[in-house]
Amino acid sequence: MAPKIFIDGEHGTTGLQIRTRMAGRRDVELLSIPEAERRNAAMREDMLNSADIAILCLPDDASKEAVQMVSANNNVRVIDTSTAFRVNPGWAYGFAEMDGAQADRIKAARFVANPGCYPTGAIGLIRPLRAAGLLPDGYPVTVNAVSGYTGGGKQMIAQMENPDHPDAITAPHFLYGLPLTHKHVPEMTVHGLLDRAPIFSPSVGKFAQGMIVQVPLHLGDLAEGTTMESIHAALVAHYAGQEIVTVVPLAESKALSRVNAVELEGKDTMKLFVFGTPGASQVNLVALLDNLGKGASGAAVQNMDLMLAS
């Protein structure tokens, strides 16, 4: 019998993308609440408790409520895509390539917290350097990023795509999170192995899907002898054998004159780059991904597959 999967919040942006990725699969059975019963709390609870894996695509409070509904049913495993549990030590963090043991942690977990889109890029760049001893304690990490507007969900999609919307957004690019208290900072800090919170400056561009995350570094403030080449080597070693997260060779990065935020649109992979001039004192680390791919729905399906393989 095929494992039963219930997407709680299947009509939202992330939920719809997960359904698209699972269309045509015969190795799982998708449970669904009829459109007319979407607000039927009893039916929702029954669906949650009938699933082998429940994927929660909900706001934080609704996710917490859903987890309570299945807390006594050990037959139900959960993947949550909200920010509610990402730094909870009782949950496995769903970034399988984060370190060599993380995929096995996800396989064995009952509860998996799907990473945020920005943290996927930031942690993907920072954690290998912390693990290799290149990024010292106390380093003032800065993360700059731009996302496609689908990361803002249905409301922002309407604001960006409908010029008649009462709160239409016409700017081609805008900063937000100006008080420096973005909800993704805690998971960047915890899973990036940082001893102080990074300065995080997020922004949105007038494109639907895609993301660039940048972490600029001063080499002179890193571990003694750290170079652009040693940083690249640490990333290559960390992601050796991985197919979803890849490190672009230095020669290929050097040949680029620009990085296109939408290059990986529709893909569930992530590319990492190291930019700089050999012998210079600065480097810029860049992660390229689809905010709805490896940054959300693609990661959720990847985590589901790992859990089903356990």
Curated annotation (Swiss-Prot):
SUPFAM superfamilies: Glyceraldehyde-3-phosphate dehydrogenase-like, C-terminal domain (SSF55347), NAD(P)-binding Rossmann-fold domains (SSF51735). Catalyzes the NADPH-dependent reduction of N-acetyl-5-glutamyl phosphate to yield N-acetyl-L-glutamate 5-semialdehyde. Its main location: cytoplasm. Pathway: Amino-acid biosynthesis; L-arginine biosynthesis; N(2)-acetyl-L-ornithine from L-glutamate: step 3/4. It is found in: Cytoplasm. One of its GO terms (molecular function) is N-acetyl-gamma-glutamyl-phosphate reductase activity. The keyword Oxidoreductase applies. One of its GO terms (cellular component) is cytoplasm. Belongs to the NAGSA dehydrogenase family. Type 2 subfamily. InterPro entries: AGPR_AS (IPR023013), AGPR_type-2 (IPR010136), NAD(P)-bd_dom_sf (IPR036291), NAGSA_dehydrogenase (IPR050085), Semialdehyde_DH_NAD-bd (IPR000534). The gene is argC. The active site is at C117. It catalyses: N-acetyl-L-glutamate 5-semialdehyde + phosphate + NADP(+) = N-acetyl-L-glutamyl 5-phosphate + NADPH + H(+). This is N-acetyl-gamma-glutamyl-phosphate reductase. One of its GO terms (biological process) is L-arginine biosynthetic process. Its EC number is 1.2.1.38. Signal peptide: none annotated. Keywords: Amino-acid biosynthesis, Arginine biosynthesis, Cytoplasm, NADP, Oxidoreductase.
